[in-house]
Amino acid sequence: MKFTFKIQQYQTEAVEAVVNVFRGQGMHANAAYLRDRGIENKPADSQLSLLEDEEVYADTGFKNENIQLTDEQLLMNIRKQQTVNNIKLSSALVKDLGRCSLDIEMETGTGKTYVYIKTMFELNKQYGWSKFIVVVPSIAIREGVKKTFEITAEHFMEHYGKRARFFVYNSSNLTQLDAFSSDGGINVMIINTQAFASSLKEDGKSKEARIIYSKRDEFGSRRPIDVIKANRPIIILDEPQKMGGDITQKALKNFDPLFALNYSATHAKQHNLVYVLDALDAYNKRLVKKIEVKGFEVKNLRG
């Protein structure tokens, strides 16, 4: 079955609010680096050959290019987007994860998963960034995100002429991390904190913690966390308020992210907010059938 997706203006605006923060970055090809393939057992009489030349080529990895903008330029771009979207201007750049942490506030049911997938494609088109990690708070949301990637694949192929390679992190299938590192296209790792939270703590006692932070014989005596962080991934947090707050934020620094995008209808912690589609906006645009008001608080308004 082929799904047809209508591009909504508010979704385009949400994408542009993020992409425009990096205006001035320019287009850069993925930064190539020498990928650690780990220890491999080679024949004792191994000599230089065409085969070994091919193996050297296979050692190449592709990571996200660094942000060329200064903190002052990033903050200026953020404030421009806040002005456009009638949001209270940020006084400082928030750098909880990487160079900046941006908040995108979207009411539940308005297609935020579609929005951040489209944002990946636009960031790749405009700036060349291609390595992403989507972090979700539950298995149910993880499966929903995976399904959205599946059903929108043809849609984005039609618009961008390429597909995103996506996979769910599985500590028993670490070879996926090698493909994530060596492929130059758009690559997305989806991971849920319910299955991974204990391993976010480097001194965790769980099986997952021992795997991600320890050198694995079956993984060429490498630590999976080192393979992941070498790519300088862009972190996308789906419903971050459900992920354990500061503990998760601190642990995610182990991924050495380029920057972070937070998508939620109710942000528990404020970063640099660049787009808002609240319940009233969603209702006025007929995106939801009704809203229930139990009290109100005025926030994010300029003036």
Feature locations, PLM:
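RecA-like P-loop NTPase motor core of helicase/translocase proteins
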Residues: 1-303
